[in-house]
């Protein structure tokens, strides 16, 4: 009897035009190859197949290690929140660094060539906007470490994004801010004890954003250091003797703040 009541209720709602929302998720993911400046880029797309309507798209830019399992997992986490997430390949050919020396080489080469950064970011953005599940007018970006610096630079140079979020991003790599050109709202999550971001770099970027009238938030987590959102940070820190460490509290709190931030962007 109870089952029959549920069936009749669903039929009634469908007949009256009321949308029926299912709590069941079906996260699908796939690799997407594209080109930027003649280089093959290997992106990664994730979304909930059971959501029928178009939804916001989020670009996810990797740490200095490259587009690895960690960053693809973040894309899947965003898909579970109802977004279409596209993990960007900034290095090309899906290159992954296994050692900090390689990571430094890959990231520094791009940091010195912002035109290539813009080209690769823009091509990934175009791929995301064209996905049939995506509302092309609702695009944001998040980035980690090296990727945090990338999304900040793109936003501060006037990229057409609703918002960007930087997690333990490279704040010292930020270029000049174009006053009046910034369209995106910005949120920065930083570890208070992050050795990779100096006090001067933090003060400099905040001063630049204030002077340019940027809508931004800066959140600092006590006792958190670089890579605080990455559960593998402890392993990397010990293996290579570099100041990286996972901080579960900062990870949880920053992700919660991100969810609120994204909801505010697209409401």
Model-predicted regions and their roles:
Residues 181-186, 212-215:
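Short, proline-enriched alpha-helix->beta-strand connector loops that line the catalytic pocket
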Residues 74, 198-209, 221:
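Short alpha-helix in the alpha/beta-hydrolase fold that links the catalytic acid
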Residues 210, 215-267:
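C-terminal catalytic histidine-bearing segment of alpha/beta-hydrolase fold enzymes
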Residues 121-182:
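Primarily recognizes the serine-hydrolase "nucleophile elbow" in alpha/beta-hydrolase
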Residues 193-197, 226:
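Acidic catalytic loop of the alpha/beta-hydrolase fold
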Residues 31-133, 231-245:
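Serine-hydrolase catalytic machinery in alpha/beta-hydrolase-like enzymes
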Residues 7-17:
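Bacterial N-terminal signal peptides
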Residues 188-190:
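Short beta-strand/loop motif that positions the catalytic acidic residue
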């Amino acid at each position: 009897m109870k089952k029959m009541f549920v069936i009749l209720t669903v039929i009634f709602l469908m007949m009256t035009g009321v949308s029926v929302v299912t709590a069941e998720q079906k996260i699908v993911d796939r690799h997407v190859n594209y080109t930027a400046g003649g280089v093959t880029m290997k992106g990664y797309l994730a979304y909930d197949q059971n959501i029928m309507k178009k939804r916001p798209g989020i670009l996810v830019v990797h740490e200095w290690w490259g587009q690895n399992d960690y960053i693809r997992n973040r894309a899947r986490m965003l898909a579970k929140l109802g977004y279409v997430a596209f993990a960007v390949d900034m290095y090309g050919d899906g290159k992954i660094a296994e050692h900090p020396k390689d990571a430094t080489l890959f990231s520094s080469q791009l940091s010195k060539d912002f035109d290539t950064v813009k080209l690769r970011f823009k091509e990934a953005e175009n791929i995301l906007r064209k996905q049939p599940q995506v509302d092309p007018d609702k695009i944001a970006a998040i980035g980690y470490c090296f990727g945090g610096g990338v999304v900040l630079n793109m936003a501060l140079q006037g990229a057409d994004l609703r918002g960007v979020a930087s997690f333990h991003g490279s704040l010292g790599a930020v270029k000049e801010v174009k006053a009046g050109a910034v369209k995106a709202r910005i949120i920065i999550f930083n570890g208070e004890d992050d050795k990779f971001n100096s006090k001067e770099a933090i003060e400099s970027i905040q001063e630049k954003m204030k002077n340019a009238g940027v809508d931004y938030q800066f959140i600092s987590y006590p006792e958190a250091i670089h890579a605080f959102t990455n559960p593998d940070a402890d392993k990397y820190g010990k293996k290579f003797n570099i100041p990286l460490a996972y901080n579960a509290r900062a990870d949880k709190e920053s992700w919660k703040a991100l969810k609120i931030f994204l909801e505010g962007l697209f409401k």
